[in-house]
Each structure stands twice: as structure tokens, then as C-alpha cells.
Regions:
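General beta-strand structural signal in soluble alpha/beta enzymes
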Residues: 49, 88, 125-131
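Short, conserved loop/helix-junction motifs that constitute active-site signature segments
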Residues: 78-84, 119-121, 144-145
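Conserved catalytic-site region of short-chain dehydrogenase/reductase
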Residues: 96, 133-137
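Rossmann-fold dehydrogenase core element
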Residues: 106-130
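NAD(P)+-binding Rossmann beta1-loop-alpha1 motif at the extreme N-terminus of oxidoreductases
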Residues: 1-45
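Rossmann-like NAD(P)-binding element
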Residues: 44-47, 52-100
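Short beta-strand and adjoining strand-loop segment in the mid-core
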Residues: 101-109, 141-157
């Protein structure tokens, strides 16, 4: 199985490291190709880099580890490629404000998961995961005892 990780910030790096440590193949794509290349070099032979389009095409699972607004844009651009794929969304409906803080980008009562699910094509398998843990916890708490709890949700059986 191959997992594409789109975005190699804190969440993308953590997910990629854990997958490779578990023996899984990852394909990395990022806005700044040099960041993806550096991570692939660190991770070794189970990691490679390519374009977003090729990463999605070649993968069984696609993790979009990007800001929510970027995720919406990527889904609009690549929706047809996502049919039959497992799409993992760790995003939260926030954006950076002018002061370096974060602000909610959706009205109260509307979730990022429901928005993303509505943007996916028929045949995509949506999983909402990793958004309840900060990147630091995701990086440090996996594969430890006692085990951390990671919530996820999907409509698939």
C-alpha cells in the first residue's frame, strides 16, 4: 500500500515518519519541493517525492496535511483523481490571522469534515483523523505505553 502525504509541515512529517517506521511506503508532495525532498532523504528508501497530481494518482491513501483553505482548493483541483481513494483529513477550520494567531473560518455549527465530505467525488472514502491531537503529541506519543487515544470518523463500513 502507498500513502501520499500532501504537505510536509508538522502533521505531514509526523504521519510520514510513523508510516515509514511501520514499513509503509509514502509519497510526499509539498508546495516547497525542497522540504519534501529533505524529508524523503531523512526517511530513506520507503519515501519518495513527486507532484501533488502524481502522488494522488499513485497512492491508495491520500493524507492532506495542509491548512483548511488550501485543502478546499486542492480538492477542487484534483477531485476526479480521488475516486476510489481513501482520503484522510486532519484539518481544522482555522486560518492564521495577521498577528500569528488562528481564527475560525467556518460559521458555528458547520464542521470542516462536513465541508470536505461534500467536496469529495462519489467513490472516495473519507476519514477524518489526526485533527484532535497537536503535531507535537502526534510525533511523540505514538507507539508508546500507555497508548494515546486517536479519534477518527468515517461513513464507510
Amino acid at each position: 500500500m502507498t500513502t501520499a502525504i500532501i504537505g510536509v509541515g508538522n502533521i505531514g512529517k509526523s504521519v510520514a515518519r510513523h508510516l515509514v517506521n511501520g514499513g509503509e511506503r509514502v509519497v510526499l508532495a509539498a508546495r516547497d519541493e525542497s522540504n519534501a525532498t529533505a524529508l524523503a532523504n531523512e526517511l530513506g528508501e520507503l519515501a519518495s517525492t513527486t507532484s501533488v497530481e502524481k502522488a494522488i494518482t499513485d497512492a491508495d491513501v491520500v493524507v492532506f496535511a495542509v491548512w483548511f483553505d488550501t485543502l478546499k482548493d486542492l480538492l477542487a483541483q484534483h477531485a476526479d483523481l480521488l475516486r476510489g481513494k481513501v482520503v484522510v483529513d486532519p484539518s481544522n477550520p482555522v486560518a492564521q490571522d495577521a498577528n500569528g494567531g488562528v481564527v475560525r473560518t467556518l460559521p458555528d455549527g458547520q464542521s470542516s469534515g462536513s465541508v470536505v465530505a461534500g467536496l469529495l467525488p462519489s467513490g472516495a472514502h473519507f476519514v477524518k483523523a489526526f485533527g484532535t491531537l497537536g503535531a507535537e503529541s502526534l510525533a511523540s506519543e505514538a507507539n508508546r505505553t500507555p497508548r494515546a487515544v486517536l479519534f477518527y470518523a468515517t461513513d464507510d463500513d
